[in-house]
Amino acid sequence: MEGPMSSDTNTRAPVPPFTLESAIQKVRMAEDAWNTRNPEQVSLAYTIDGVWRNRSEFLIGREAIVQFLTRKWDKELDYRLIKELWAFHGTRIAVRFAYEWRDEEGSWFRSYGNENWEFADSGLMRRRIASINDIPITEQDRKYFWPIGRRPDDHPGLSELGL
């Protein structure tokens, strides 16, 4: 992204340029943070002036991110997410993901998506571009059953689950 970016002095390792190992670590850190469903905690991984496109919504800044995530997790109940590294280069990482959730009526969904991430030198994400599709599923179609929170290390990832 061109132009001045955040003057945020916080650093969040690993920092770019990414290696295979550090990119995988960054993806798992993001998955773990999102599985907390804590908007304030999640927002700290982004620059103060971070830019997002999530589906058709455009956001700028941590406060907008917190507000968005609060709305999201008020709607998406019993949220469980798995992310997987797709590609990386320099300051950028691409991931694919799938998460399961239910609405207030008890209907279940699996949401599939791709994200493109760009990081500042500090290791904070300064740009996130996400494309997501929601697919209705039955209770019997669910694949994510770990307790709410971090996915256990021995739980299969997306590729292992055939997603």
Which residues are covered by each model-predicted region?
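Short, aromatic-enriched amphipathic alpha-helices that serve as compact interaction elements
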Residues: T19-N35
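A beta-strand edge to alpha-helix "cap/lid" segment located at domain peripheries
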Residues: E2-F18, Q67-L163
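Short, well-ordered alpha-helical segments enriched in acidic and aromatic residues
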Residues: T36-D49, R53, W117
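Short solvent-exposed beta->alpha transition segments
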Residues: V51-T70
